Amino acid sequence: MAKAKAKQEPQQQRQTLQATYRFVLFFIAGSLAAFAFHALTSSTGSLMGWRLRLHHLPTAHYLQTRDEFAVYSVDELNAFKEFYDKSISDSVGASFTEAEQTNIKEAMGALRLAQEMYMAGKDDKAARLFEHALALAPKHPEVLLRYGEFLEHNQRNIVLADQYYFQALCISPSNSEALANRQRTADVVQTLDERRLISLDEKRDALSAIHEANSALRRAKKEAYFQHIYHSVGIEGNTMTLAQTRSVLETRMAVDGKSIDEHNEILGMDLAMKYINASLVQKLEITLKDILELHRRVLGHVDPIEGGEFRRNQVYVGGHVPPGPGDLAILMQRFEHWLNSEHSSSLHPVNYAALAHYKLVHIHPFVDGNGRTSRLLMNTLLMRAGYPPVIIPKQQRSKYYHFLKLANEGDIRPFVRFIADCTEKTLDLYLWATSDLPQQIPMLIQTENEGHVLAQLQPHIAQSIPELHESGSGSGSGADPIRVP
């Protein structure tokens, strides 16, 4: 009996030891599984969180950027995801064509040489090399980052530098250097933008103080009316000169050598602008019906069947693919809600008008006339806030479309600043036209004798308007400048 009990004790000890081993192994396995699960489900992403902690970067602006996505719909978020996925796939060398890979290699070489020139103090050569690298690889994060740093520290162009940092982050969200640079520039750029808007308000108030009966103001408004129509249809490819545009509007007579459609585009804009002046400017809210009525007048002479109607087919605008026709009704309802929301009305009028322009042209609800209708809506909102209708010069067509493209890629700010530029130039022209200056004041377009007109201005005036005109060829329209008595 004692022997049997002695044999059982070692056996029980072995069983107890085995049970202990199994418990320890189970505990270790469970701990590893829990750690792995926690790492995979961390809220900010393990890689990005690790990099942020490693470099001790502040995350306030990054989190603020993420919070802004809460206002977007599911469709808009999906569009952002598609753009991000495409950007990620584009960053993989295997996805590039042979020609694109060659361009990237050349861009990297130009980038290295640009940095060498910069370190050697040869800033002009460095600037040209940076621009060359950007032209070869406009979506390469390293090119965007290094060129932005050059602009920030050497050229003192912090606004453009911030724009390139933002683009680099859109393409490579975990780029720690781009994050750090953006943290440094974001507040400064926001302050500059706010100061610009305050300056616009001051000029608007100065213009509003001029009595409506002022003869110079009345002449300026009449000239600006012709200019607005001329430039808006010109952006869309209309070849009428300013003098011909004025003739069509004043005489309703045909111009030899010009198509019927070009005449009708001008007449349609005239109808739409008269509708704005007579009705929309006084309305408290802009409805979907108002937008359709505006578009119906834009196409009233060109295509009366499609005027005021949503498109029924898919369209393609360069690299942008607008929503399908089945989504237009709900998207336009959302746009109408945004247009009249309390949040939108709290925005600065220039920001509000520029955003409305972009949102409508991004949806692209019509077969034709989307750009003209969007610009008319923008000016309606500006006029309700006391601003004059803003003229976007046809000579800046490429800039206009470039900034719209940047907005499609995720950064609306360059487009808003472009609209602010056009707003300020329009305000300046009104103020100069109603001032006591005895000289001729040119309008926004370029003419063959533009250089002579500017040379006739007093030196201190000429110095105050260095960016009145875009460089490039003139329109040859022979437009009359405003003459101030």
UniProtKB/Swiss-Prot annotation:
It is found in: Membrane. Its main location: membrane. The active site is at residue 364. GO terms for biological process: detection of light stimulus involved in visual perception; histamine transport; protein adenylylation; response to endoplasmic reticulum stress; visual behavior. It is a single-pass membrane protein. One of its GO terms (molecular function) is ATP binding. Residues 286-421 form the Fido domain. The chain crosses the membrane at residues 21-43. This is Protein adenylyltransferase Fic.
